């Protein structure tokens, strides 16, 4: 069943999570005004899946069940699936800024791979167990929170060496009917308005850290789960032309001796497969982040065009404005092209699903992570200083100032002052507000820091092939000297014949 956004909001009423926000308990997540922008953003993924014009991108046939499911819950099987997912994420983020639910997709795809790997290595039954869970999630059209990033404590110490073991989620007890987990996940996207959490390890583990290599599904309102969250976006702020409607909450999620039955446990101490799960999720998620931030970039490009027009400028005549816009387009479409390439060159996994190309996915995410601030700078350049100097919206209706402001803050004659002010506040919201800083930081660190992506690129790039390519060119004489003799690759020889020891003077 494909739910609508209204259905999704209503479904949250069936849960009673323990949530704290701004120092108080939240009685009803669905009715909390400070969380409404986050619920609205996730809701976009539901409504768009029900629109006929978006059906190809937003829905897919699940190969293991034959059912039509939301793209955000689908297991990718082909390069086309990867490309459609990338385009779907861009689409929903064009509307919402960050639709958040694509994390569910990324975790499910990583689990599909890791559970099969664990079964093959250890004779476990995780994969069938996961498939049963997957089909249930798809049938109910749920949204899953990815509880992956642990609190970590002293980062110079491994999980098992921490003074406080609860800075990482770990297994404290194994029972005949399940496991008990304890610990803290520090950064959980959309935590209060998820249906369930997928608890996953955030790093590779050693045998000594086996208790921390745990993956399981936990309802958001399970006994022992506490969520301490922040508000989503800028709810209730009149100047927030975008993020008063759409935003994202993040939460610290504490697991205090939470019982998880075995049918919801997908790894329990298999540390090597925990590493597979972590790296697989990272690749899927970085691929999705490319689509998400391209959607955000589309908002900046559109707002930039409107600001230029309302300021009375013509990019065809004002080359510096045109150049700035082209640079913004180049950045957005440049990292998005890496996402397309990662889709086209995706590799089949032994589990039967497909994985985005690791190098292209990481290069694309690294580009957007390191260029998000350039995107904001270019948007500021074409907009001008008005976006941060504009009086608040209350002055738009103040009889003492309204007429004067409308007269002096108008730009082009055929564009009313209120339209110019509206787009200026939109641009401020996206690029020069607290929410703008949030977009910058999640772009930089979301899905892993730039250093993590650099390591993956270095680890997976075919450097040996590139080295051998040049060695073959040298062997073929492509880099021969002027005499036509090629340089030999034989160690210790600088030419084809080798160096000759000169005979002593006066000999012979």
Regions found by a protein language model. Give the residues of each.
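Buried hydrophobic positions in well-ordered alpha/beta secondary-structure cores of metabolic enzymes
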Residues: 23, 181-183, 255, 325
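Long, well-ordered mid-to-C-terminal structural blocks that present hydrophobic/aromatic surfaces
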Residues: 296-299, 306-374
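A short core secondary-structure module
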Residues: 184, 188-235
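Glycine-rich beta->alpha junctions and the first turn(s) of the following alpha-helix
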Residues: 236-333
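Internal helix-loop-helix
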Residues: 47-144, 196
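Alpha-helix capping/hinge segments and adjacent helical runs
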Residues: 359-494, 498
């Amino acid at each position: 069943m494909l739910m609508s956004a209204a259905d999704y909001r209503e479904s949250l009423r069936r849960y009673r999570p323990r949530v704290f926000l701004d120092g108080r308990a939240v009685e009803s997540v669905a009715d909390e005004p400070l969380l409404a922008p986050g619920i609205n953003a996730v809701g976009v993924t539901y409504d768009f899946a029900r629109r006929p014009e978006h059906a190809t991108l937003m829905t897919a046939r699940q190969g293991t069940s034959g059912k039509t499911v939301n793209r955000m819950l689908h297991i990718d099987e082909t390069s086309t699936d990867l490309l459609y997912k990338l385009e779907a994420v861009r689409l929903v983020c064009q509307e919402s800024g960050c639709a958040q639910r694509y994390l569910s997709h990324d975790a499910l795809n990583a689990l599909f791979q890791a559970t099969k790997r664990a079964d093959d290595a250890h004779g476990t039954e995780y994969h069938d167990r996961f498939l049963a869970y997957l089909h249930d999630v798809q049938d109910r059209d749920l949204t899953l929170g990815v509880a992956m990033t642990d609190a970590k404590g002293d980062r110079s110490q491994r999980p098992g060496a921490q003074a406080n073991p609860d800075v990482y989620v770990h297994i404290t007890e194994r029972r005949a009917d399940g496991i008990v987990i304890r610990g803290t996940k520090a950064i959980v996207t959309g935590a209060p308005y998820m249906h369930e959490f997928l608890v996953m390890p955030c790093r590779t583990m050693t045998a000594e850290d086996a208790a921390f290599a745990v993956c399981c599904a936990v309802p958001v309102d399970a006994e022992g789960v506490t969520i301490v969250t922040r508000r989503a976006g800028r709810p209730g702020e009149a100047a927030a032309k975008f993020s008063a409607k759409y935003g994202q909450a993040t939460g610290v999620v504490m697991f205090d001796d939470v019982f998880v039955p075995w049918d919801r446990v997908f790894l329990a101490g298999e540390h090597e497969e925990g590493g597979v799960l972590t790296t697989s999720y990272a690749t899927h998620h970085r691929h999705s982040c490319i689509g998400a931030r391209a959607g955000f970039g589309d908002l900046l490009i559109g707002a930039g065009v409107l600001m230029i027009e309302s300021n009375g400028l013509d990019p065809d005549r004002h080359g510096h404005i045109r150049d700035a816009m082209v640079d913004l387009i180049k950045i957005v479409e440049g990292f998005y092209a890496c996402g397309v390439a990662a889709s086209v060159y995706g590799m089949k996994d032994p589990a039967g699903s497909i994985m985005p190309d690791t190098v292209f996915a990481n290069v694309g995410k690294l580009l957007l992570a390191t260029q998000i601030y350039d995107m904001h700078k270019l948007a500021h350049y074409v907009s001008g200083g008005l976006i941060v100097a504009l009086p608040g919206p209350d002055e738009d209706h103040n009889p003492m100032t309204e007429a004067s402001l409308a007269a002096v803050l108008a730009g082009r004659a055929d564009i009313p002052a209120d339209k110019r002010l509206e787009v200026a506040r939109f641009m401020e919201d996206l690029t020069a507000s607290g929410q703008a800083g949030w977009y910058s930081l999640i772009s930089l660190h979301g899905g892993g820091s730039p250093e993590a992506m650099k390591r993956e690129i270095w680890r997976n790039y075919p450097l040996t092939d590139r080295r051998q390519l040049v060695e073959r060119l040298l062997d073929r004489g492509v880099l021969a000297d002027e005499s036509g003799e090629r340089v030999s690759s034989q160690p210790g020889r600088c030419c084809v014949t080798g160096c000759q020891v000169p005979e002593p003077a006066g000999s012979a």
